A protein has these predicted regions:
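Short catalytic/metal-binding and nucleic-acid-binding patches
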Residues: 1-159
């Protein structure tokens, strides 16, 4: 199945991740990291809860739980102005989470390109997503994500 048509289901956990084109850098300084998180909060937090994340110079990982169907519907109606007439295709309620994540990635990429006078894609497309289907997998994934930076530094406290 094409990952682009894979629906992110309400009340389910997912591993969301991506990397720079050809493994290239997506964060050059602290301001980039902070802006990335600000955009994540703006676009993704309204539709998901976050359980873990890791931002690395060339990639990122998030463990998220999609909010309930009722919460997503409330967001879609009140924030995205979803109506019966425009509730189809990419604008359908079942696509609201993917759409918000795509807006987040696009907003960060456009800003990064403007700041660094570059053009074209910054991140591989589409963003990667994997449904977390067990508590054991969730626990191991959170450990993996939190330990990801230790490969860069011997002492994680200085990362």
């Amino acid at each position: 199945m094409d990952i682009r048509i894979q629906i992110l289901e309400p009340d389910c956990y997912y591993h969301i991740y991506n990397r720079g084109i050809n493994g290239g850098e997506i964060f050059k300084n602290t301001d980039n990291y902070l802006f990335f998180l600000k955009q994540f909060s703006k676009y993704v937090i309204p539709v998901c809860d976050i359980y873990a994340y890791c931002l690395m110079p060339n990639h990122f990982h998030f463990v998220i739980k999609i909010k309930s169907k009722e919460d997503l519907l409330f967001f879609a109606i009140n924030e995205l102005k979803l109506t019966k007439e425009n509730n189809e295709g990419l604008h359908a309620i079942q696509n609201v989470v993917s759409k918000q994540i795509s807006k987040f990635i696009s907003s960060y990429s456009q800003s990064y390109n403007k700041v660094y006078n570059r053009h074209g894609a910054l991140l591989e497309s589409p963003f990667k997503r994997k449904k977390i289907d067990s508590e054991e997998y969730l626990r191991n994934l959170i450990l993996y994500i939190h330990q990801n930076p230790t490969d860069l530094k011997r002492d994680f406290k200085t990362y």
